[in-house]
């Protein structure tokens, strides 16, 4: 984890362990560069599925390649930058290319925010319905897997708040408030308990 490496570097410097601090810095720089080069698809970071035997990336566009079930693949995940939001809170700075991070946050809002769930199909738990709005766990602007991970069609407040905080750090105040206000409107005291948000309240 890039955030852990940055934190370890700072702790090593505090403990005057220059050797380990340098090692952490080197690993971070290589890892950060690798993530931007291999996982960023121009709009967001995606999940590269690997062969469990060889650990090589599977070609998800090859119809002859068997893709394991319950994966994310090329989906846009709502909390793909949760580590970045935590790094900002801890004063660790950016874990990847700043422009890529900002582009990803914009893509999460673009692809995952739904203004009206009246026609949204969800085979799992429904924490949002009807004309309510929210951020989906995942969307597939580049094509969905045949058997995606189970919770992609849900909305969970904990993940929405994390994404909104990430947006605030990237200067997307209007989008962040749109997400937060959507949560609060769903938990208005009439439809749901305003003091116990599902996935962010007494459920955990």
What spans do the regions from the language model cover?
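Extended, hydrophobic alpha-helical segments in both membrane/secreted and soluble proteins
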Residues: 1-8, 31, 35, 159-163, ...
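Glycine- and acidic
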Residues: 17, 144-149, 160-165, 203
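A short small-residue
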Residues: 7-12, 188-196
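Well-ordered alpha-helical scaffold segments within catalytic/enzyme domains
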Residues: 1-18, 83-96, 161-172
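Short, contiguous, pocket-lining structural segments
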Residues: 20-23, 27, 78-79, 155-156, ...
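Extended glycan-interaction surfaces of carbohydrate-active proteins
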Residues: 36-156, 178-194
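C-terminal structured "cap/appendage" subdomains that terminate the fold
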Residues: 197-204
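Hydrophobic, small-residue-rich alpha-helical packing segments that form membrane-like cores
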Residues: 2-40, 44, 50-53
